[in-house]
Amino acid sequence: AARPLARLYGLPPEAAPAVILGLTGGYPVGAATVAELLQQGALSREAAARVNAFCNCASPGFCIGLVGLGVFGSARTGAVLYGIHALSALLTGLVVARGPMAQSAGGRAAAAPREGFASAFCGATQQAARTALTVTAFLTVFSVLLRLLRPALRALPYGDMLAGLIELTNGLDELTLLPLTICAQLTLASFLLGFGGLAVQFQARALTAPFALPSGAFTLGKLLHG
């Protein structure tokens, strides 16, 4: 799968794990994989910024279970939403990732020295813990923020829709409360899944922050994916 993805997007084959894991693992696995590839020296900052712009996706389980069954009462609806979501991510990549890659001798980070099993296992465990802590922290902060803003949002037309732009899960839970047709609700759900909400976006940014990736492509990618 690595070489077809590389040819399609003009990215190095080493970027393929971020795309595949991002599409299957859910938020923010794509960003975590990009950070790991940067740490290993497998990607340049330019390639990492390009793939990071479209590899942060909802998982099939999230779309089918939480959105399909939980919100719309239909696993089939969730599966269709995931298919649209995944296809939109891949199409977004054609916009934000294609183009000539700058050739720079110093473009890649220095590869980390090979580690023994014990060291690698400890490092992977610590990284997983940091990722889980980052996800939990941003979910907590934005859930509290949304609770504080709830009275003001409900005073606005379609304020419940704005909730999803802040914290995705809470916004999706309230979709069926909106006075919209089912078609409009599904369209809005698809947009929110692609955009991810600010909580998801900040999770991804936090994981790649040590590498100072340019943010323009990421912002454009989330808007286009939505």
Please provide the spans of the model-predicted regions.
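Alpha-helical transmembrane segments of multi-pass membrane proteins
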Residues: P17, Q126, R130, T134, ...
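Alpha-helical membrane-inserting segments
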Residues: L91-G99, V141, L145, L149, ...
